[in-house]
C-alpha cells in the first residue's frame, strides 16, 4: 500500500503508535470543530494521477447520468420563506456516476478494500468497527458534476 498511501506522513497501518494516535486525535479535533478533516497528500501524486486516469474515461463514456431541477434545499417550499425567496430558486444539476463494478481492478478499489483505512476511519469516528460494503455496485461510487 506504500505505493498508494503516504504512510510516513499518515501511519494508517500503525494506529497504535504515538504517531498514529496523534493523527487520530488531530482528525477527531478537526471533525468536531469543522465537521470534516483533510489529509493533504494522503494519496501519492503519481497514484492520484493513475486513479483519475482509470476513472475519467469511464466517466466520459459510460457513467450513469442523473439530471434534476431543484433548489438548495431539495424541497418545493420551506416554512418561513416566501415562494419568490432566492433560496428557493431552482437550478439544474447533473451528476455522472461510475460504480465499483466498472473499475474492479483499480487502485481506488484497492484503497477502499484496505482494512487499515476502515480501521482509521472507525477510530476517528469513535466507532467499534467499519466494514467495506459487499454490494459490487454501491460499495464505491465516483461522481462528477458537470453539464
For each predicted feature, which ranges?
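Signature of the catalytic double-stranded beta-helix
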Residues: 43-46, 53-62, 83-136
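Long, hydrophobic, well-ordered secondary-structure blocks that form the structural core
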Residues: 136-142
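Short functional linear motifs
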Residues: 28, 48-49
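Short amphipathic
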Residues: 37-43
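Conserved short histidine dyad/triad with adjacent acidic residue
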Residues: 125, 142-147
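Fe(II)/2-oxoglutarate
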Residues: 1-33
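A common structural microfeature
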Residues: 34-36, 48
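Short, solvent-exposed beta-strand-terminating loops
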Residues: 57-79
